[in-house]
């Protein structure tokens, strides 16, 4: 009897560096062969097989999220949490990782959690899935990785999903995502700058995150490499925003060369620190500069908009007590983050 791993359990398998080789070689399951049935009597054996397959203990696996069809016995236990699915199954919903063991794809996980996560949390999840990091219970607060999906793939998957819980919120969130973030701070900064005013953002144009800039010969001589990847790039405005986080303090000379190379090729460079983001006056000056460069007219914000903006920044930006020496950050751990044993 097959099991279909879903929700947070599926995310942890998908995003764990320890399990990346298993996921890398998994193939999409045949949509016509999917039948969401799990016999309770066969679950114990399936969990044991899954632990052997993953090379982890049942304690490391944690309580397993499984998705089942409506009408299937689904009394949750200390080992298993069942989730009912009654709508049509979207195409590309599962990866087959072994005989009888299926894993929800990143796109399907996003849809599953859209029914329960607040919008901002869903946006942060989407940015991580489309980026090259994932929140984890580690000192940094995240692990590096490779993108498991893209905004294009996620949007296409959600377009195919019909009549299911969370679909409207998932589609709304996907419209605000951008590929390529390398850290939670990049995602947070992007959302503050680009989300609509009605959601607390500044409504600026979406930049490219960590996109490739090919340097001229002169700029290459300065930087030492033919290309560089700015944190936030507004291509039409020739504007770059560089976040001064932990990497800057490790190698400030390299960042200075980056700035000189970009300016040599005509880019305007704006540096941003966590302190500036937390200071409303400094943040607004940065926003005005981006708006001017991109041709965005800034309208006065009502009291309601200002309140939403403060609430958004309070949710996305680490508190002052979580800023460590050298502007290193300690992020609040989300419940769907990787546990330490899988990071």
Language-model-derived ranges and their functions:
Residues 1-165, 197, 301-303, 310-343:
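Short gly/ser-rich loop at a beta-strand->alpha-helix junction or flexible surface loop bordering the NTP-binding
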Residues 146-343:
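Surface segments flanking catalytic/ligand-binding clefts of nucleic-acid enzymes
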């Amino acid at each position: 009897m097959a099991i279909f791993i879903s929700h947070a359990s599926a995310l942890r398998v998908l995003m764990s560096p320890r399990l990346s080789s298993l996921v890398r070689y998994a193939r999409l399951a045949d949509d016509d062969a999917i039948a969401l049935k799990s016999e309770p009597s066969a679950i114990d054996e399936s969990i044991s097989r899954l632990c052997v397959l993953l090379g982890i203990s049942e304690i490391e696996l944690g309580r397993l999220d499984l998705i089942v069809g409506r009408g299937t016995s689904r009394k949750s236990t200390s080992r298993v949490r069942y989730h009912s699915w009654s709508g049509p199954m979207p195409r590309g919903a599962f990866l087959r990782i072994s005989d009888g063991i299926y894993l929800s794809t990143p796109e399907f996980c996003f849809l599953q959690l859209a029914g329960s996560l607040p919008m901002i949390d869903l946006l942060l999840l989407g940015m991580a899935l489309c980026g090259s990091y994932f929140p984890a219970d580690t000192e940094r607060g995240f692990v590096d990785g490779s993108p498991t999906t893209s905004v294009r793939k996620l949007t296409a998957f959600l377009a195919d999903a019909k009549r299911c819980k969370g679909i409207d919120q998932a589609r709304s969130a996907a419209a605000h995502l951008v590929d390529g973030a390398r850290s939670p701070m990049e995602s947070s900064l992007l959302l503050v700058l680009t989300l609509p005013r009605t959601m607390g953002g500044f409504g600026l144009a979406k930049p490219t995150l960590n996109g490739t800039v090919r340097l001229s010969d002169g700029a290459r001589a300065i930087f030492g490499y033919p290309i560089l990847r700015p944190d936030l790039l507004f291509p039409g405005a020739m504007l770059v925003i560089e976040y001064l986080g932990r990497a800057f303090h490790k190698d400030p000379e390299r960042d200075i060369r980056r700035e000189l190379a970009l300016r040599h090729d005509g880019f305007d460079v704006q540096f941003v620190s966590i302190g500036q983001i937390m200071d409303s006056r400094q943040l607004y000056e940065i926003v005005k500069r981006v708006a001017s460069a991109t041709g965005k007219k800034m309208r006065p914000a009502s009291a309601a908009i200002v309140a939403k903006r403060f609430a958004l920044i309070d949710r996305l930006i680490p508190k002052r007590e979580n800023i460590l020496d050298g502007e290193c950050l300690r992020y609040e751990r989300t419940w769907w983050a990787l546990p330490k044993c899988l990071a």
